[in-house]
Amino acid sequence: MPNTFNSTLKTFTLALGLVLLLAGCKQNSSEAAFDNYHQRLTNVLDIDPTPVPNTNVLPLPQKRDLNQALPDIRIGLLDAYELRQCGLFQLIAERNSILGKVQDKTRSLQYELLFLNGLSYCLTQLKPDSDLVAELTPIYQQKQQQLPMIFWNMIFTGEEWRKQLTLGHELVDSEKNSEFLTSLSAFSYVADLVNNNVTTTPAPIAPTLIEKKYQDLLHHQQQIYNSRYLGDLFYSLARTTTWLNAITAQLNANQDLILCGNNMNQQKAKYLRNVFYKFYVADIQRYLAHLDSQYQQIQPVLQQIHQQLSQAPIQVTPDMQGYIDAYINGEAYRQFHQATLDHVKFWQRLFKQCNFKVGQ
């Protein structure tokens, strides 16, 4: 019996190890494609591959460095009771409860949006000369001024949204397009919320009719909970830039080894051309186009959010400004695009020098 158990355990362990190995290979397939391309080029040139340096990325700063401190402006239950005709009493009672005081950043934003709408609605329903209007008006104005900071805190310190923007450590899987679409949908929804509530002031709606208006915010929060796709996309831009720059530099440094011209043996150049088509065009170029397309879709959304929120007096640390410049304003993408162009230019020169026709 012990022998049977040990045999079964060994079989299970080996099977588990194989599964993990295969999973690891699949996760790193894009990195492996660059490594394979690099290795084959150096094999043709008969040189040692230059070690590819580590990729230095700008991390998302810690929560404590990003959180915007806000004074807690509340209406007491006594005053709130007078607002029952506006439908605000239940909302304020829930906020003042124990559970209301420990809301996550997304639910806090949802509450503030509902509360602002309720206040605005009340101000249209109460008599203009009432004491309550005089009390509520400055509260409404202060809350409206705080709204950009509340959005900022949700995006950069809220667990689910922050996870999306935290840089990963491996290249994205180009087959996981659904994760990207989920992230794009979530941040596009937030961009619309910012535009409709910060950039402009929406017309108030009766609280009983608006209850479900911001449920989609919680839906998107749930959808992105287990994903960090955008952070992986940002890392992928930086990592592929490192790869391309390293490979291009080595090709340029060894160009004298590639003979082309009349009465010359162009065999090495032809082998390089084969590597270019088989491994760069077929795999690498397609992957680079995938990254390019996804970033160009998400970047305008993130930039729109940032530009609209930056109209408010938000305190941004130098480290955060570096992160914003790199991944939201597009500096990392600019470097990625330049690295791609530099690599393609090497091949254009080689094809011209060796009189190779494109596609042959």
Walk through the language-model features, giving the residues of each.
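Alpha-helical interaction segments
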Residues: A15, Q141-Q142, F151, A332-A339
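N-terminal Sec/ER secretory leader and immediately downstream segment
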Residues: S30-S183
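Extended, low-hydrophobicity segments enriched in charged/polar residues
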Residues: I139-N252
